[in-house]
């Protein structure tokens, strides 16, 4: 049986730890110290490092972790998995869509999806974990009620990436890498103020955050219901974008206008 737990880092990052009570794989360790503390508190060995994209707040802790854990639980070199199309330090396995990642400590298998947009070579890892069920680790592509900024990709690329994630089974748990939900929900409500699912979710987010509790993971089905970036083809979203002066002449144009609105939203 596997557990997935968040390791808070920086101001709003989540490093995800997948563990079996003995060893852990960590996803997007932007800094090492919180990971070391988590491992020590739970008596876990570090078994693998998994990276979704090249930004420093997702891989900045790899060097320090390898200095402390050069080998895995059985003495083999510690695996560092990362996207083929990006600059990933210390990477031992480069992956792209269609590849399978098989970890030993803990025993985990992922299939890889290419999800460019936030960065050019961003990937996501999809699996069905014993005890945790279907999961996707999606870095900064899909957030709870939002999506990542387009630093390197185009609106068409990001829309295609989000379509790919939205097509996963509805009960897939979405493990994103930031606690941006409150601000994302404020924007989503500006886009779809009459969405009842969103209203209920906004109230829930306030309760969770006031208690200091993460709002993630959510599920793919939940995101389809409340996330404007998965709903950019809906008439309500198109009307809101048009009211802001956005171009809704096509799917990519409407998505780009929606993303541009969010970029300037306060």
UniProtKB/Swiss-Prot annotation:
Q: Name one GO biological process term.
A: methylglyoxal catabolic process to D-lactate via S-lactoyl-glutathione
- CDD domains in the record: hydroxyacylglutathione_hydrolase_MBL-fold
The note on the cofactor says: Binds 2 Zn(2+) ions per subunit.
Q: Say which family it is in.
A: Belongs to the metallo-beta-lactamase superfamily. Glyoxalase II family.
Q: How does it assemble?
A: Monomer.
Please give the function described in this protein's UniProt entry. Thiolesterase that catalyzes the hydrolysis of S-D-lactoyl-glutathione to form glutathione and D-lactic acid.
The Gene Ontology terms for molecular function here are: hydroxyacylglutathione hydrolase activity; metal ion binding
* Binding positions for Zn(2+) 1 per the UniProt entry: 53, 55, 118, 140
Protein name (database record): Hydroxyacylglutathione hydrolase
- Key word NADP present: no
Q: Which domain of life is it from?
A: Bacteria
Kindly give the Gene3D superfamilies that the UniProt entry links to this protein: Ribonuclease Z/Hydroxyacylglutathione hydrolase-like
Reaction(s) catalysed (UniProt annotation):
an S-(2-hydroxyacyl)glutathione + H2O = a 2-hydroxy carboxylate + glutathione + H(+)
User: What is its EC class?
Assistant: hydrolase
Gene name? gloB
Residues the record lists as binding Zn(2+) 2: 57-58, 140, 178
Q: What is its EC number?
A: 3.1.2.6
Annotated pathway: Secondary metabolite metabolism; methylglyoxal degradation; (R)-lactate from methylglyoxal: step 2/2
């Amino acid at each position: 049986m596997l557990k997935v737990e968040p390791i808070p880092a920086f101001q709003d990052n989540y490093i995800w730890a997948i563990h079996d009570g003995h060893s852990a794989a960590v996803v997007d360790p932007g800094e090492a110290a919180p990971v070391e503390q988590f491992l020590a508190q739970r008596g876990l060995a570090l078994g693998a490092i998994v990276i979704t994209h090249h930004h420093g707040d997702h891989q900045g802790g790899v060097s320090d972790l390898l200095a402390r854990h050069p080998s895995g639980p059985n003495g083999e070199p510690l695996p560092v998995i990362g996207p083929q199309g990006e600059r990933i330090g210390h990477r031992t396995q480069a992956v792209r869509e269609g590849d399978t990642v098989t970890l030993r400590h803990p025993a985990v298998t992922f299939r890889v999806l290419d999800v460019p947009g936030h960065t050019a070579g961003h990937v996501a890892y999809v699996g069905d974990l014993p005890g945790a069920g279907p999961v996707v680790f999606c870095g900064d592509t899909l957030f709870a009620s939002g999506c990542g900024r387009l630093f390197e990709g185009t609106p068409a690329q990001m829309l295609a990436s989000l379509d790919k994630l939205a097509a996963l089974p509805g009960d897939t748990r979405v493990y994103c890498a930031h606690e941006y939900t409150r601000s994302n929900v404020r924007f989503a409500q500006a886009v779809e103020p009459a969405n009842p699912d969103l209203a209920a979710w906004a109230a829930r987010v306030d309760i969770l955050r006031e208690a200091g509790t993460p709002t993630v993971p959510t599920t793919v089905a939940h995101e389809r219901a409340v996330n404007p970036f998965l709903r950019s083809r809906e008439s309500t979203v198109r009307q809101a974008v048009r009211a802001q002066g956005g171009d809704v002449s096509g799917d990519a144009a409407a998505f780009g206008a929606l993303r541009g609105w969010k970029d300037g939203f306060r």
